Amino acid sequence: MPSDCKYSVDTELVHVEGNEDQYHASSVPIYQSATFKQPCLEHMGKFDYTRSGNPTRSVLQVHLAKLMKAKHAFVTSNGMSALDMILRCCKSNSHVVAGHDLYGGSDRLLSFNQRQYGFKVDNVDTSDLAAFEAALRPDTNLVLIESPTNPRISICDIRAIVKITRSKAKDALLVMDNTMLSPVLCNPLDFGYDIVYESATKYLSGHHDLMGGVIATKSDEIAKSVFFNINAMGAAMAPFECFLLLRGIKTMGLRVERAQQNAIEIAKFLKSKGLQVNFPGLDPDAKSTAIFYSFARGPGAVMSVFTGDVEVSKTIVNTTKLFEISVSFGAVNSLISMPAYMSHASIKKEVRDARGLSEDLIRICVGIENVDDLKADLENALAQANFKQN
């Protein structure tokens, strides 16, 4: 069981407990071994096969459980495998209520479960609590949300979601994808969620040099099911990736803070140019701002931008130099993309349109570069696109 957090999150990120290396290495060693020798048949050791357990992975999981305010944490090969392991806790024909503005890969996996296992999935605008409540049934098995959502950056009241779910579907698993905020800015388990998961590829690692997923829970029963699924499917993170993730986590506080401060300036800058910008807290008087800061400690560093013209958006994306055209977010470098053509292209256009995922939507993921350089890059892109303020 992980230790309770004793210090501020910035300190806890750096100090890793549970390293039992016999040589007292200050950095957790990479146990790059598929199997482990046993002392004898009668007394098996703590580890036998890396698919089931590995010393490097064990230290990482204890560290993540502490940071995510969980009793148990598990690391998987990528973020989608983390969600897959969670969904495998549900039986065939389960009823799922999920946000309608989800990461495209999550939407694709839910659609697969609809076809393959008879899942009944209702996608709703989770920022509309009345619509969310109407979608719930007494036999709802799982609720899946993001806040902020990806890519529109809509805010849903994660506290109210818990209260409504417990009153209408008390046995449903409450699951939140916290990738946008990371443990530095939000701890959903503190608000009553059964499971929180993240793509470790993003802020947790921070350098786009590994693929990984994290699942955290306070429930022994859920942990037992999740571990069985990971072990049975062979979905656990490999030792080298565990080492990289342990290293990346140590600087996450600094990275998130710098990227977040840059993002605040970039959001204000783009808004001043007449663009529609969705970014948490950009409008201090908006109701969504008060809701957001009831569960988050900062806005993060991802925003959605609407130009009103697809060709203008394409020119902006193609013209930037420092903002690299790429999917993903949460690394030290700034990225830019058009979700309708990239991360959410697997969703049919008519469905995207119904969910407000317009073709002109640009997702900007701000990194830790000099903010004046970033603004100059965007200024030039806007000029090249001949964007005119309405």
Curated annotation (Swiss-Prot):
The organism encoding this protein is Schizosaccharomyces pombe (strain 972 / ATCC 24843)
As stated in the Swiss-Prot or TrEMBL entry, residues carrying the post-translational modification N6-(pyridoxal phosphate)lysine are K202
Tell me which cofactor or cofactors this protein depends on.
Answer: pyridoxal 5'-phosphate
Which InterPro entries does the protein's record reference?
Answer: Cys/Met-Metab_PyrdxlP-dep_enz, Cys_b_lyase_euk, Cys_met_metab_PP, PyrdxlP-dep_Trfase, PyrdxlP-dep_Trfase_major, PyrdxlP-dep_Trfase_small
An example Gene Ontology biological process: transsulfuration
Subcellular location, record wording: Cytoplasm; Nucleus
Give EC number(s), comma-separated.
4.4.1.13
UniProt superkingdom? Eukaryota
Q: What GO MF terms are annotated? A: carbon-sulfur lyase activity; cysteine-S-conjugate beta-lyase activity; pyridoxal phosphate binding
Q: Which family does it belong to?
A: Belongs to the trans-sulfuration enzymes family.
Q: Give any Gene Ontology cellular component.
A: cytoplasm
Q: What is this protein called?
A: Cystathionine beta-lyase
One of the Pfam families matching this protein, by short name: Cys_Met_Meta_PP
EC primary class = lyase
The catalytic activity, as recorded, is:
L,L-cystathionine + H2O = L-homocysteine + pyruvate + NH4(+); an S-substituted L-cysteine + H2O = a thiol + pyruvate + NH4(+)
Q: Which gene encodes it?
A: str3
Sections of the chain in a coiled coil:
none
